[in-house]
Amino acid sequence: MMFATKRGTRDVYGETLAELGHQDPSIVVLTADLAGSTKTSIFAAEHPDRFYNMGVAEANMIGTAAGFALSGFRPFVSTFAMFATGKAWEQIRQVVAYPKTPVRIVATHAGLTVGEDGASHQMLEDIGNMRVLPNMSIIAPSDAIEAAGAIRFVAAYDDGPVYVRLARAPFPVIHDEGHTFEFGKAEILAQGTDVTIAACGLMVSVALEAHEVLAGDGIAAEVVNVSSIKPLDRETLLTSARKTGVVVTAEEHQIVNGLGSAICELLSEELPTLVVRVGVDDRFGQSGNADALLAHYGLDVDGLIAATKHALSKANG
């Protein structure tokens, strides 16, 4: 399967946020000296009176955003995922998650595909850092169209904090323009009966390509887009696992405490099922271009196909 268009989720974030700024005067945007890289510079150009550059002071940015939220505003905070969920974690826990303050944390440059910046900037633990926090919701859009829908959703969502995970590198657009994002819902993108591939972020497009190749080998893989990681769509995932009996998870994240762990927790309690997790296995990232890094860590189409066949081999004894 070849996708005609690639777009960066951070690019559509900046455009959508600026558009929403014209519709909702309560939206304010804060960044930690990275407006250009996070594309919040687009909002800043159109709404300079509601844009705040907090400098390289991420914890202060989170605290200020919480204050805005408690004063009736709808704050978005943006920086790289490494800094948003690493440097600012304590502040997120204390003044955002604990009091259930509706702050929208939209982090860019998540995962391996930061590329040449290397391990210091490749945040592979952010889903885990956010998933462990009570009251925190997590969205990892599968493409630019879903990212735009997710941003529109969180702009109007006032029932607690949300973490939205975006990437630096452009990746395939898999949805049509009319796609509607549904919070808390997983999406069956390809039907199958032999194995379930549950993926998030850019790994969804990889899963769809793997689905086509596996079909040629006589393997019917069901592809599930799990863009809402917390809350998890238990019903859809359980139904798919019950149908196929084997699950492969795919994420551009550590396999510990990410999407794979969340699905393992669900299945171990409700429907014991063989799960093979595809992701970064207890390693740090390294410098390199995006495609080379994905291949090196087994997150390309070939790697996912191999993992899927391995899962089926284990399941069949």
Predicted segment positions?
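Thiamine diphosphate
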Residues: M1-R165, P170, T180, ...
